[in-house]
Design a protein with these regions (language model features):
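Structural detector for short beta-strands of small beta-barrel domains
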Residues: 152-174
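Short, Lys/Arg- and Gly-enriched loop/turn segments at beta-strand edges
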Residues: 219-232
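Short, basic/aromatic beta-hairpin or loop at an interaction surface
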Residues: 179-197
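N-terminal intrinsically disordered, low-complexity, charge/repeat-rich segments that act as generic
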Residues: 1-148
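Short nucleic-acid-contacting surface segments enriched for D/E, G, S/T with interspersed K/R
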Residues: 197-215
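Short peripheral tails and domain-boundary helices/loops at the edges of structured domains
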Residues: 229-257
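Short, glycine-/Ser/Thr-/acidic-enriched flexible segments
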Residues: 169, 179, 221
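Short solvent-exposed strand/turn elements
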Residues: 175-183, 249-252
Length: 257
């Protein structure tokens, strides 16, 4: 039986909410629901109050004829799947221009023009493009220290993936490729082993083992991914990086295949 899309979404929204970055002050409600593997109207209401994530789910659902918490919708936003390819660029542009708080409409328009109107409503693209168009407008002229800080922020805030190499009580050792600045571009660095937190009380981490691939958000393992999901996350991350590097270069570079 497929997991609830509500719980899948909550797993990936949990850590930034705990850190106070996103959503209402309802982390214990989210945590309790994840531990018990149950959903209710209170959890749904809490997730609807995430000012960035929930409008993205609405956009994907509206564009593809799905319900907002159909499993495939939050999966598309956090991990990536074929639904992203069905969201018209014009819809995403209108959404970014009018609905995303904190975005300069002029910069949004310039960004979409430089990308020929092609951009996925994917969490990692949102994260990377936010820094590319607002935090780091100087692009290649950034100092080395600024580049390091931006790369670290992007790496923490995106959804990354890692292969489990060791399992502790509340920490996993994972083999991961972090984000770095390389030759003025954001890129995946060579693999390294890192420690991340996880909650063994949340399914499926009670049985996590070496060789599993997990999704990671703010140094916290969110879920164990299927082979299809890990391939999709790698695929859409590569697309996101290609597009964002065009923004950093002033729209002069084509996305990498």
């Amino acid at each position: 039986m497929k997991e609830s899309g509500i719980l899948f979404h909550a797993k990936h929204a949990y850590m930034p909410n705990l850190l106070g970055y996103c959503g209402p002050d309802e982390n214990e409600r989210i945590n309790e629901s994840l531990r018990e593997g149950k959903t209710d109207d209170g959890l749904v209401h809490t997730l609807q109050e995430f000012e960035a994530a929930y409008p993205f789910l609405e956009l994907i659902a509206r564009s593809t004829g799905r319900k907002v918490f159909d499993y495939s919708v939050p999966e598309a936003y956090w991990i990536g799947n074929g639904l992203l390819d069905r969201v018209p660029g014009s819809e995403f542009y209108s959404f970014s221009h009018h609905e995303l708080k904190g975005r300069d409409p002029r910069k949004v328009k310039e960004a979409f023009k430089s990308l020929d109107g092609v951009a996925p409503p994917h969490h990692s693209f949102y994260v990377m493009s936010t820094y590319a168009t607002t935090v780091v407008p100087d692009g290649p002229n950034l100092s080395n220290e600024s580049r390091r800080k931006v790369a670290q922020l992007v790496d923490n805030c995106r959804i990354s993936w890692g292969e489990v190499r060791g399992v502790g009580k509340r920490e996993l050792q994972v083999r991961i490729r972090p984000i770095e600045f390389r030759n003025g571009r954001l890129a995946l660095a060579p693999p390294t082993v890192r420690r991340v937190q996880y909650n063994p009380e949340v399914k499926p981490f009670s049985s996590v083992r070496s060789g599993d691939v997990v999704s990671i958000h703010w140094n916290f393992a969110c879920d164990v991914l299927t082979n299809r999901q890990s391939k999709n996350l790698a695929k859409y991350t590569a697309i996101d990086l290609g597009l964002v590097n065009r923004l950093l270069a002033g729209g002069t570079r084509r996305p990498e295949k």
